[in-house]
Swiss-Prot record:
Post-translational modification note: Proteolytic processing gives rise to the active protein.
GO CC term (a single one): periplasmic space
Official protein name in the record: Acid shock protein
Lineage: Bacteria, Pseudomonadati, Pseudomonadota, Gammaproteobacteria, Enterobacterales
InterPro entries: Acid_shock
Gene, per the UniProt record: asr
Signal sequence bounds: 1-21
Amino acid sequence: MKKVLALVVAATMGLSAAAFAADNTAAPAPAAAATTTTTAAPAKAPAAKTHHKKSHKKAVEQKAQAAKKHHKKAAEQKPAAEQKAQAAKKHHKKAAAQKPAVEQKAQAAKKHHKKAVKHDAAKPAAQPAA
């Protein structure tokens, strides 16, 4: 039984057919018949692959296509001066968006003031109900 198991393991590991046949002759006849049925599937050669021929373009067309790609890439790039101006615009917007510290402090004060007003308004409404 151990030899049968060893043969199955050997077949799955892909040992050569000659070594596999030598092991089969040493095994008893019933065991050999059992191993040939179990290992026949892994020993099969893979199905023949059909090779599809790739259609090759002419070298001139390929070169022209590559030139087109590089040309597009160059056209998309902005000049360095414009890029710098764009960065300056961004920084300018950021500076304009910031509020002065005084206004921010006033906003915080407004929030606290509103909260206090809401609290005071809620108390008188509760008193007449009681």
